[in-house]
Amino acid sequence: MAQVINTNSLSLITQNNINKNQSALSSSIERLSSGLRINSAKDDAAGQAIANRFTSNIKGLTQAARNANDGISVAQTTEGALSEINNNLQRIRELTVQASTGTNSDSDLDSIQDEIKSRLDEIDRVSGQTQFNGVNVLAKDGSMKIQVGANDGQTITIDLKKIDSDTLGLNGFNVNGKGETANTAATLKDMSGFTAAAAPGGTVGVTQYTDKSAVASSVDILNAVAGADGNKVTTSADVGFGTPAAAVTYTYNKDTNSYSAASDDISSANLAAFLNPQARDTTKATVTIGGKDQDVNIDKSGNLTAADDGAVLYMDATGNLTKNNAGGDTQATLAKVATATGAKAATIQTDKGTFTSDGTAFDGASMSIDANTFANAVKNDTYTATVGAKTYSVTTGSAAADTAYMSNGVLSDTPPTYYAQADGSITTTEDAAAGKLVYKGSDGKLTTDTTSKAESTSDPLAALDDAISQIDKFRSSLGAVQNRLDSAVTNLNNTTTNLSEAQSRIQDADYATEVSNMSKAQIIQQAGNSVLAKANQVPQQVLSLLQG
């Protein structure tokens, strides 16, 4: 080894080793001071990512357990109110049994009826005022989703029901046949014109003549035809057809499960408005002519373009759609397709329904619409109005046709005229200045009177038993969901514990190991400093050569 002064390689090597040991010592001290093995991604990149995901799960599951406990509280609050309602019903039943014996005087029956009315009023008060965190739990039908997991869709639903004297079938409950009973606000389903028709089909005449900017659809009223089935339609965005500009009559055929329609005006724009939902500028469709399919786009004006490249489509002399305009053909439109005759007769299928011409000129002739498109149809016995600026004329297929009109969220039956309000109630214009609210009496008939003359309830004990049965069924469902939520909380806590242990094994520092590493690093550091001092003295040995 050469004897040099300028470069002390031994000192450099020693310094490098001291620096490495210093880094290890710093890491050990950092881990011991924080309690974490992973203080940054450089300590363990993969471990840091895994531990971070565990953190998300643990925090989410911890909150989910709190949510589930809140859900249990909701169910307990609701069941507590139902328990009190049940107590009132049991007392009413006891009083009814007492009133049913012939030994009571009129005064006795009056006293019994007074307490029954007081108990029913208390049931209504409990229904209207029982809340959990500001939510009325017995005031209306609905559901409450409880998030019981750390990810989307991990919920448990609590079904809530409206429970009051009316929903229990006890509105106007009477044992003495005296006084008056309060009538309940009528809704659309109480209108006779919206009950299921006896005939297998019906005809619906639709006339649209209100605000042009309103989003409305003839399909809303088609869904009310007898034989339709499905869920309630609340907005026209749920349906696939727009509104034809001219009046069209639709007839439902139960055997073929389809609607047929007749119209005197079938211009491209009108047909496009019918096939094209008003929320969109264009509609994708498949046009079938002579067994050949062509995917197209249909704009608001009814013009057809190819779906694949947007090229303009033309209808040639044989009735086929083509991108080639060599023969001087004009652009294909919905009107041309719809009015094609004979072998050129076309079928236009959108994602919401199918239009089929019958092979004759479409000048008042029939067309058919696939009934399967109306998956959101409304059952007649549960029909509710879609509030919006629109007017409909409905004729069912029954022998004695019932006709109703709806405009701007208003339902009318002439005579008299009824209005369906946004909250589902009905008013009438018998009092043209203000409009009277329409009620349903205890006999089920519509009236503008707020009260009805009281009559003794027929089969009162059976009515009470049915009401108590409703309470029992509701309480059973709440008990079941409480048990389910309690089980969910237990599982969430177990999962959180296991995940926390797994995260700890990855992320937390092992103090025995780290203390050992720190002690080792400190000893090496001391030794390194001592050796460095000796290494720095090596160049001085060269001086002995100069002094010799």
UniProtKB/Swiss-Prot annotation:
One Gene Ontology MF term: structural molecule activity
Family to which this protein belongs: Belongs to the bacterial flagellin family.
Cellular component terms per the entry's GO annotation: bacterial-type flagellum; extracellular region
Coiled coil ranges: none
Function: Flagellin is the subunit protein which polymerizes to form the filaments of bacterial flagella.
Name of this chain's protein: Flagellin
Phylogenetic classification of the source organism: Bacteria, Pseudomonadati, Pseudomonadota, Gammaproteobacteria, Enterobacterales
Main location: secreted
Alphabetic keyword roster: Bacterial flagellum, Secreted
Domain of life, source organism: Bacteria
Compartment(s) of residence: Secreted; Bacterial flagellum
